[in-house]
């Protein structure tokens, strides 16, 4: 889940928790120059974009394999049951990716973005 809160600057407290979007294992997040929230999802091996007004989720980079899809479904079930899923994070999950997808680096709307992983590789992706 990606949660949204109201921030009270004077006190530093949070209130009015709401769910912006539901997705497997949200990790690193970054606001795009267009105002959408981009989120890396290691378990699904995807980069997702969330419209912050509507909560609509769009896949912007997909490196999910068939085995990875099955692992993601199993991982979601385990998370819902309070169980671990680290044993699902195998090379079969990542396919041709040089490691588990964990983040992204964004430029402006005309620039490519980069996909980061647990290793040292960066993958350059042209925006459509």
List the model feature ranges, each with a label.
Residues 112-128:
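C-terminal/domain-terminus segments
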Residues 19-38, 44, 70-73, 90-111:
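Beta-rich, blade/repeat-based domains predominating
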Residues 7, 42-43, 52, 117-118:
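Short loop/turn segments immediately following the C-termini of beta-strands
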Residues 1-25, 54-62, 80-92:
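Blade-edge beta-strand/turn elements of extracellular beta-propeller
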Residues 3, 38, 46-48, 58, ...:
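General beta-strand recognition
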Residues 1, 44-46, 120-122:
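Short glycine/acidic-enriched loop and turn motifs that connect beta-strands
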Residues 2-7, 49-50, 125-127:
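Hydrophobic/aromatic beta-strand positions that recur at structurally equivalent sites within the blades
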Residues 48-76:
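Structured C-terminal portions of repeat-based eukaryotic scaffold domains
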């Amino acid at each position: 889940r990606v949660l949204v809160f109201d921030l009270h600057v004077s006190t530093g407290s949070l209130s009015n928790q709401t769910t912006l979007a539901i997705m497997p294992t949200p990790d690193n997040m970054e606001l795009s120059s267009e105002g959408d929230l981009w989120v890396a999802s290691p378990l699904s091996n995807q980069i997702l974009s969330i419209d912050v007004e509507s909560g609509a989720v769009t896949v912007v980079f997909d490196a999910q394999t068939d085995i990875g899809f099955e692992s993601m479904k199993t991982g979601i079930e385990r998370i819902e049951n309070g169980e671990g899923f680290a044993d699902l994070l195998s090379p079969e999950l990542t396919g041709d990716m040089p490691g588990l997808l964990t983040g992204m680096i964004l430029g402006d709307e005309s620039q490519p973005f980069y996909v980061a992983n647990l290793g040292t590789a960066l993958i350059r992706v042209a925006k459509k």
